[in-house]
């Protein structure tokens, strides 16, 4: 007799700098799907992608989830498959809905979404276009600019222009003419604050550019602003819904990778204490930003807010936001009356619409 439960394929890990974060997120997601509330609704098949892009079946995936860190060489069968995707692991034929819990390139950028689309199977999150546009900060910012959405001044840099001394200095002069210090240098296609540097002068700017160029050929440099960091969660496909707005507070100079994923380095205020009308503005902008880049399913939209100037700037969209114990997306929905168990259930249901 066929099972009445929906079989969900949770894919995590990935050939990305954010591999470890993906594992932490997957532990939360799988736990919520297998909770007492959801046990009669879903069957979970976990699939692990190692750091070379090879896909592994449930046996390996469950071991990684249990240990909470990447698979060790002895846990992987030999001889190893070639690098990258070759075929779906055993058991995948039973999957009815795919749930990618992947962060960064090769997972959040439209690549895996394209695979699921070719397979003709539903999946959680945005499609190819929304994922790709939202992942690439330069493409995303160009879309925001075309729609007239507010954002801080920025400039684009091609890593090829940093190879020679003369061209490097030319890039620095161009950036200094367009932006003021401090500024932030970011690889265009990485998340979780990976590869981001703050520059207070030309020397730090060039060091930051080299760091970003080692990770991505496309680089974005943003004007630093004095602002609070706010976030709003979005859920839905045909009809997008927004959560309450939350604020990230931290003692560090800026919200870098260590601050984001270390215990006791930051705290959140949910809902954020905001003047009347500001939360409504942010929630409206979050919807506009998602529609602008064709993001749906789920997204976390990040903002800067300067209270003295009463100015709001869009920072970025994350179409596969983290689900770790410190991640804002599930916390924002919890504060909006949607439990973690209800949230993952709704995401799977939305994927089938």
From Swiss-Prot:
Keywords carried by this UniProt record: ATP-binding, Cell shape, Cell wall biogenesis/degradation, Cytoplasm, Ligase, Magnesium, Manganese, Metal-binding, Nucleotide-binding, Peptidoglycan synthesis
Required co-factors: Mg(2+); Mn(2+)
UniProt-listed Gene3D superfamilies: 3.40.50.20, ATP-grasp fold, A domain, ATP-grasp fold, B domain
Top class in the EC scheme: ligase
GO biological process: cell wall organization; peptidoglycan biosynthetic process; regulation of cell shape
Reactions this protein catalyses: 2 D-alanine + ATP = D-alanyl-D-alanine + ADP + phosphate + H(+)
Residues holding Mg(2+) 2: 316, 318
Binding site for ATP: 176-231
The record's free-text note on cofactor binding: Binds 2 magnesium or manganese ions per subunit.
Cited PROSITE patterns: ATP_GRASP (PS50975), DALA_DALA_LIGASE_1 (PS00843), DALA_DALA_LIGASE_2 (PS00844)
Compartments reported by the entry: Cytoplasm
Major localization listed first in the record, in broad terms: cytoplasm
Coiled coil (UniProt feature): none
UniProt xrefs under Pfam families: Dala_Dala_lig_C (PF07478), Dala_Dala_lig_N (PF01820)
Highest taxon above the source species: Bacteria
Stretches assigned to the ATP-grasp domain: 141-349
GO cellular component, one term: cytosol
Binding site residues for Mg(2+) 1: 302, 316
GO molecular function: ATP binding; D-alanine-D-alanine ligase activity; metal ion binding
Role noted for this protein: Cell wall formation.
Similarity remark: Belongs to the D-alanine--D-alanine ligase family.
PANTHER family: D-ALANINE--D-ALANINE LIGASE, D-ALANINE--D-ALANINE LIGASE A
Protein name according to UniProt: D-alanine--D-alanine ligase
Organism this protein belongs to: Prochlorococcus marinus (strain MIT 9313)
């Amino acid at each position: 007799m066929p099972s009445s439960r929906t079989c969900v394929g949770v894919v995590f890990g990935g050939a990305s700098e954010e591999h470890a974060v993906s594992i932490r997120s997957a532990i939360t997601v799988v736990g919520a799907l297998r909770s007492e509330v959801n046990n009669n609704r879903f069957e979970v098949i976990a699939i692990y992608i190692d750091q070379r892009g090879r896909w592994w079946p449930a046996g390996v995936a469950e071991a990684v989830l249990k240990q909470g860190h990447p698979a060790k060489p002895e846990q992987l069968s030999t001889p190893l498959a070639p690098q990258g995707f070759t075929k779906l692991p055993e058991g995948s034929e039973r999957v009815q809905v795919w749930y990618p819990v992947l962060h960064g390139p090769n997972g959040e950028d439209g690549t895996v979404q394209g695979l699921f689309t070719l397979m003709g199977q539903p999946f959680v999150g945005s499609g190819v276009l929304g994922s790709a546009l939202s992942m690439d900060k330069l493409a995303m910012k160009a879309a925001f600019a075309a729609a007239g959405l507010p954002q801080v001044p920025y400039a684009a840099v091609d890593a090829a222009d940093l190879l020679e001394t003369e061209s490097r200095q030319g890039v620095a002069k161009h950036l200094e003419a367009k932006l003021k210090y401090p500024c932030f240098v970011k690889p265009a296609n990485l998340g979780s604050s990976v590869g981001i540097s703050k520059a207070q002068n030309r020397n730090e700017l060039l060091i930051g550019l080299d760091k970003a160029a080692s990770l991505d050929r496309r680089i974005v440099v943003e004007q630093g602003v004095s602002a609070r960091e706010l976030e709003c969660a979005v859920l839905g496909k045909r009809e997008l819904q927004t959560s309450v707005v939350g604020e990230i507070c931290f003692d560090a100079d800026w919200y870098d990778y260590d601050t984001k994923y270390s215990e006791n380095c930051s705290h959140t205020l949910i809902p954020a204490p905001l003047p009347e009308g500001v939360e409504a503005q942010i929630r409206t902008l979050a919807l506009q930003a998602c529609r602008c880049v064709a993001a749906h399913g789920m997204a976390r939209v990040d903002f800067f807010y300067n209270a003295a100037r009463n100015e709001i700037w869009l920072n970025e969209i994350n179409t596969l936001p983290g689900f770790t114990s410190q991640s804002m997306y599930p916390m924002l929905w919890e504060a909006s009356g949607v439990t973690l168990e209800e949230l993952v259930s709704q995401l799977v249901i939305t994927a089938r619409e």
